[in-house]
Curated annotation (Swiss-Prot):
InterPro entries: EF-hand-dom_pair, EF_Hand_1_Ca_BS, EF_hand_dom, Mit_carrier, Mitochondrial_sb/sol_carrier, Mt_carrier_dom_sf
Positions of Ca(2+) 3 binding: T161, S166
Species of provenance: Saccharomyces cerevisiae (strain ATCC 204508 / S288c) (Baker's yeast)
Membrane topology: Multi-pass membrane protein
GO molecular function list: ATP transmembrane transporter activity; ATP:ADP antiporter activity; calcium ion binding
One Gene Ontology CC term in the entry: mitochondrial inner membrane
Bilayer-crossing regions: 231-248, 307-326, 355-368, 409-428, 458-475
Name of this chain's protein: Truncated non-functional calcium-binding mitochondrial carrier SAL1-1
């Protein structure tokens, strides 16, 4: 069993001084927050680039709250932190051999999540995924551990067959010593009573994979959606969600196309009356109210679902192309960056992969989107309804410009879509980090079945303005030859 007090006070002071020297990048005996951030970058600490975590750590180190950490502050912090780290080490090191193996870390993290890894045969596949994730965390937290890796039972290996030897050379043979454990967790902030859990939460929060949901929404998931069952489930949910929101999409297209409607938020009724002296001031209302009345007079409730069938049709091909192209793009970016695995991709490369995947998916379904918009922009007094209107609109489009008209103005759509993917992902990530720093908990915990975690309504709402102008440009270009910024704002402000 490892003894806690195996080093003298003098040795401990020397070690503290050496650690503090690594953080004191300017060598003036004082460490500021900026110095600590620079030290993490210089020493290639696993939490480098995570300003929120470093700020929390600096606050804990600044014992006297003077915004500066000196050697005295650091010693007080380290002494208290090491006592907590030792107690945690003892709880994980069940065999008390002074070493922690990866399996012991797996069990501890699983207990924190109230999830079993080894004793659930029904979730064997999921368990393997969790073990692999914990293994990646082990490598992330202890990148320099290779020099200290030991293979247990090496003496007995000489007497065993090659098959037995290969069985023993597994992840379970990897371990870290208490010194390595202490040196890593000493520079990790403590939340919810566990530095290890905090470290794992940061690893999970900033090193997980990224995918795209329907309409190019960036989705963070535990592992890439696998299996035909998940694909079908995602498609069905997309069909339901699009059907539920079809009336809002119908109103959106109506307002974009009707450039003659003026917003009562941007203009006073007096100004609107001056432009149209014959109008009744009592009947001047919001464009949204006019849109609802006009559509209802056209065909009742059914009028709000015009074009929804095309929306439903494109769900499955769009999703399959999106996920497939995203994986292919990630592999290409992995080769360009020289990474061994897509998990090691930088966030910038993930942005690019997400944007390109969104563009590929949009390109594949753009003809359907174009046809849907034309159908929704049909004259209100038209006698054609349903499939007759759909087929007639398709024939008219083909006669007007053949295949070229299908891809007309698609560059505006692409510009808005790639910005939507990148901005939504960045905004969601920032908001998620803010929530985590305030609560110390993952704002969207992992589900056991591996279901995806989508950006919340706040992050979605914050960035819709950024890409909506591109959609207006694209859609109005089909309806009219010219588009003015005022018309775009009018369509947005109802």
């Amino acid at each position: 069993m490892l003894l806690k007090n195996c080093e003298t006070d003098k040795q401990r002071d020397i070690r503290y001084a050496c650690l503090f020297k690594e953080l004191d990048v300017k060598g003036n005996g004082q460490v500021t927050l900026d110095n600590l951030i620079s030290a993490f970058e210089k020493n290639d600490h696993p939490l480098k680039g995570n300003d929120e975590a470093i700020k929390m750590l600096f606050t804990a180190m600044d014992v006297n709250k003077d915004s500066v950490v000196d050697l005295s502050d650091f010693k007080k912090y380290a002494s208290n932190a090491e006592s907590q780290i030792w107690n945690g080490f003892q709880r994980i090191d069940l065999d008390h051999d002074g070493k922690i193996g990866i399996n012991e870390i797996n069990r501890y993290l699983s207990d924190l999540d109230n999830q079993s890894i080894c004793n659930n045969e029904l979730n064997h596949e999921l368990s393997n995924e969790k073990v692999n994730k914990f293994s990646r965390f082990f490598e992330w937290a202890f990148p320099k551990r290779k020099a200290n890796i030991a293979l247990r039972g090496q003496a007995s290996h000489k007497k065993n067959t090659d098959n037995d030897r290969s069985k023993k050379t597994t992840d379970s043979d990897l371990y870290v010593t208490y010194d390595q454990w202490r040196d890593f967790l000493l520079l990790v902030p403590r939340k919810q009573g566990s530095r290890l859990h905090t470290a794992y939460s940061y690893f999970y929060l900033f090193n997980e994979d990224v995918d795209l949901s329907s309409e190019g929404d960036v989705t963070l998931i535990n592992d890439f959606i696998r299996g035909f069952g998940f694909f079908i489930a995602g498609g069905i949910s997309g069909v339901i969600s699009r059907t539920c929101t079809a009336p809002f999409d119908r109103l959106k297209v109506f307002l974009i196309a009707r450039t003659d409607l003026s917003s009562i938020l941007l203009n006073s009724k007096t100004d609107l009356l001056a432009k149209n002296p014959n109008a009744d001031i009592n009947k001047i209302s919001s464009p949204l109210a006019k849109a609802v009345k006009s559509l209802y007079r056209q065909g009742g409730i059914k009028a709000f679902y015009v074009g929804n069938g095309l929306n439903v049709i494109k769900v499955f091909p769009e999703s399959s192309i999106k996920f497939g192209s995203f994986e292919v793009t990630k592999k290409i970016m992995t080769k360009l960056e020289g990474c061994r695995d897509t998990k090691d991709l930088s966030k910038f490369s993930t942005y690019i992969a997400g944007g390109l995947a969104g563009m590929a998916a949009q390109f594949s379904v753009y003809p359907i989107d174009t046809l849907k918009f034309r159908v929704q922009c049909a004259p209100l007094d038209t006698k054609l309804k349903g499939n007759n209107l759909l087929f007639q609109t398709a024939k008219d489009m083909f006669r007007e410009g053949g295949g070229q008209i299908i891809l007309q103005r698609c560059h505006s759509r692409y510009s808005g879509h790639i910005s939507l993917c990148c901005i939504r992902f960045g905004d969601f990530f920032c908001l998620k980090k803010m929530v985590y720093c305030q609560t110390g908990k993952d704002p969207e915990p992992t589900t056991r079945s591996g279901h995806s975690k989508q950006p919340g309504c706040t992050s979605n709402g914050c960035i819709q303005w950024n890409c909506r102008s591109f959609c207006c440009l694209s859609n109005q270009s089909f309806k009219n030859k010219t588009t003015s910024p005022r018309n775009i704002c009018t369509s947005l402000c109802v």
